[in-house]
Amino acid sequence: MAALLRGFSQCVDATHPYAAEVSANIRAACAEAGVPLRRLLRDPGGSFTGIRVDSPEEAASFLAKQMGNILLAIGAKGLPAFSGLDSVRLYPRVLPVEESLAACRRAGIPTRNIIAMHGPFSRALNAAILEQYRIRWMVTKDGGAAGGFGEKLAAARDAGAELVVIGRPKETGDGLEDVLAWLLAAECQKEE
């Protein structure tokens, strides 16, 4: 990745808030290439009434004591945490790629329960999925507006489902205005 950065004067890491491994790779590549880096933080999804947990494992532990079907809108990497739950209750929404489908198979998810689609999803589509599969619990990450968090929140309310939100990893960075100012300041210095 460092080779890709050579010739660039700056880099902005605007990856998903949960893409810690990718962000670490970007930091290492920028350090190796000598390219200044800023982390752009997404605005959080806002307040909601629901359950907030720190990890997929904590969500699974909580849901093991609850009744009802569960929509797992967390990606395929989080599925192993839910392997101790009755798989007929689990409805993972994953990308329609072999890697995600294989993760579902490894987790013992019945094929009829796999929802393989590209997002982000509208409020109406989220609500339709919640109603179609009689979802009582929707497990999601707080991807902010870009990740469709508001649509998930509204759809859960519409369908009478409860949200279980996996909190963001701790990270440092800047908001959009600060990152833009940093980029513009560097551009102005180049022109002088």
Predicted stretch roles:
Residues M1, E58-A59, G78-A81, E99-S100, ...:
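Short acidic active-site motifs
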Residues A2-A59:
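Glycine/small-residue-rich loop that forms an oxyanion/phosphate-binding "nest" at active or ligand-binding sites
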Residues S9-Q10, N69, R136-W137:
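Structural motif
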Residues R39-E57, C104, K170-E192:
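Intrinsically disordered or low-complexity boundary/linker segments at protein termini
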Residues I51-K65, A73-K77, F121-R123:
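Active-site glycine-rich loop that binds ribose-phosphate moieties when present
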Residues I70-I114:
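Anionic-ligand binding region
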Residues R105-A159, V164-I166:
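A C-terminal functional module that forms or caps the active site or interfaces directly
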